[in-house]
A protein has these predicted regions:
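All-alpha helical catalytic cores of prenyl diphosphate-utilizing isoprenoid enzymes
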Residues: 44-48, 62-70, 146-230
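Conserved N-terminal diphosphate/IPP-binding helix and adjacent helical/loop segment
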Residues: 1-97, 102, 106-107, 113-141, ...
Length: 230
């Protein structure tokens, strides 16, 4: 029989959130931590090795943080659209964005072969080191790459689960879904155009502008603002 579905609700989510972007970021991180704890419990119920090797690694990766820029824009969009009072939905949307960003960064580091992320080994490097330490057979680099792709997929699954739960509980759920779907596709499109430009050696201005619009203007600014305003 399936066990109870993990929930991420907590008392702080129903309180009136602080009215500044930095305060909202701190509140979002508290929500994000509850989400992570719930997903880790689910991972442990699924498989102990998976939980220890992958879910715990992903949790540590997300907790290392970053600029949390998209969260700030989600909050600003909510406030600009007249948001006040209960901020639980907007904080959960911001947390979902941070999980989506984790997916994007993990996969980006695999594609670029980047050794570091946020002052620590990139996910594929960390997995490769674990492979070597365990004296497991086969290529450590190949294992690290494959495992990191799966970790990015897991981050995307966590992000989609959280956004779906939030949208289903919101009267504005259809608009949230619409913005989320568009943003995910634009994120992948921007990454592909970047990859394609590198492979072709293109330095055309219109190519660079298209990549900047997809990866930065829309994914980082416009869509988070629209998600908050939804």
């Amino acid at each position: 029989m399936l066990g109870p579905r993990p929930t991420v609700a907590g008392p702080a989510e129903t309180n009136h959130a602080p009215l500044t972007a930095p305060g909202a970021t701190r509140a979002m991180e508290a929500v994000l931590e509850r989400v992570i704890q719930a997903r880790l419990r689910q991972a442990r119920d699924t498989d102990a090795v998976f939980a220890l090797d992958m879910a715990d690694r992903l949790a540590a990766y997300v907790r290392r943080g970053g600029k949390r820029l998209r969260t700030a824009f989600v909050w600003c969009g909510w406030r600009a659209a007249g948001g006040s009072g209960d901020a639980s939905a907007v904080l959960r949307t911001g947390a979902a964005l941070e999980l989506l960003q984790a997916c994007a960064l993990i996969h980006d580091d695999v594609m670029d072969g980047s050794p570091l992320r946020r002052g620590a080994p990139a996910m594929h490097v960390d997995f490769a080191r674990g492979h070597r330490a365990g004296r497991t057979g086969g290529s450590a680099e190949s294992f690290g790459t494959s495992a990191a792709v799966l970790a990015g997929d897991l981050a995307l699954a966590w992000a989609d689960d959280l956004l779906t739960e939030t949208a289903l509980a919101s009267p504005h759920g259809p608009r949230l879904f619409e913005e989320w779907r568009a943003m995910r596709t634009e994120m992948v499109a921007g990454q592909y155009r970047d990859l394609r430009a590198q492979a072709s050696g293109s330095s055309a201005a219109d190519e660079a502008l298209t990549i900047a619009v997809l990866k930065s203007a829309r994914y980082t600014v416009a869509r988070p603002l629209a998600l908050g305003a939804s």
